Amino acid sequence: MKKIILNLIITVLVCTGFLFISFGQTIVTTKHNLSLTGPGTVKAATESEICKFCHTPHNSLPVRPLWNHTNSGAVYTLYTSSTLNAIPGQPDGSSILCLACHDGTVALGNIVSGPAVTFSGGVTVMPAGTKNISTDLSNDHPISFLYNAALATADGQLVTPAGITPPVHLENSKVQCTSCHDPHKNLYSSFLVTTSQTSALCMSCHSRTYWATSTHKTSVKTWNATAPNPWPHTPYTTVANNACENCHNPHNAGGKLRLLNYAPEENNCLNCHSGTVATSTKNIQTQLAKTYKHNVAGYLGVHDPIENANIITKHVECIDCHNPHAVNATTATAPLAKGFDLGVSGINQSGTNVAAVTNSYEICYKCHTGQTWSSPSAVPRRIVQNNVRLEFATTNPSFHPVVGPRNNAEVALNLIAPNTATTVLYCTACHASDGAGSPAGPHGSTFPQILKLQYATTFGTTESATAYALCYSCHNRTNLLAGTNSFREHSKHVVSAKIPCSECHDPHGISSTQGTATNNSNLINFNSAVVTASGGVIQFIDQGVRRGSCTLICHGKNHNPITY
């Protein structure tokens, strides 16, 4: 009997404001003090008791811990995602208690043990805003799901239940609101049980592959104060300190799938990569405003992280080429993937899907391997091939050295240093943003095909270092036009006749399934719009070192044949 009386006295003392001991902070100084004495704007008009809005020692609901608030009884819309291995159910346990106020359906003063408490300012339910998460939980971190070893194994990027340590905790083996929030203390803002700085709270459960070395984990870049604020829902001022919340929001996320800050996928990247946080060399937003670009703004909700690497539905998003959990500044030599390509899916040279690419070109193969929606070649070719994987194969009669070193020693004689016979190129050697200091990737360009330099393809173009700047960035212009160690009629064609390189040369390569070393060496694959048959024949024949013949009609000139 004495013990019961003592417990009752303690309860009364706590709830009337005389005793508050809670590891350095009490509920008294938090917004969960809904009494007249509370520090927040949402509080009772006259009620001075503090605990009664949630607890009562008598006449409570049959739910621990002595619950005193009327529950909602709502049916909630739950979070779903193709990448979610957990199975969330309707809220239960302590979460249903939190939602009694935070779903905005029940008056804050509706208590079980007595008449409803009147709130000041005419407030009844939780006011609209970030704290009223409504009955739509599809944009909130999932709750009330079983978190066990099987889930951690199935997901592959979760800490095992045994590895989750206080103050983060599971409730009866489930994730609940109280796994992350302590309603009685607000030491870390938002009543979090531990700091969200560097996403320490997230990392209590999540163990993302590659994250340890990601730039998004380590960067100390700050916002330059040019609107909009990239981190409106956090108090932190660097990329590293915001960590997960650079892109994600655990409550009221703008992009429900994967709790992204914004529904348009690219906006979760461009909020920093617009020159306001990332440096000018990583200002992608400027590049995407150019005429020729990977049009990430043209698609919404099409990309799925678990999609087949051999993309079926046409789309492009930043995430198709970059893994934000993995990106870093690691350098590499072609064709190996650099740090900004780590952890991205692709298709290898054998045509096999890979979860994480080894070589950079494997990312490009996801979209540029002859899909039905692939754009035709910018220059119509006698041999038609839209599958760049086949065009770059090192078994081809000729190819640009993207997969491996070139097979033509003659070409190497006219390369500009540091290019040599063994040089391998990235696709971005040609396809990249134009302009000095631009980002390295093929984000956007003023030149067609997202080329980083001008590549004239129009008949009648006056030859100049600028007109064919792309070709001349590797190939020695002086030697080519002089015929030094090269086809000696280059000047006659390109300078005198004003015939562009593209009339004869197919820059990617000619597949061994369609061409031969005799007819298609030196990237010879004629422009079918201007080259017609001579005597029923269109043919180039390689006759040895810098020797060959052409049988065709080109711009009215009959080669029947012409030998050089």
What kind of region is each of these model predictions?
Residues 1-4:
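Positively charged n-region of N-terminal signal peptides that target proteins for export
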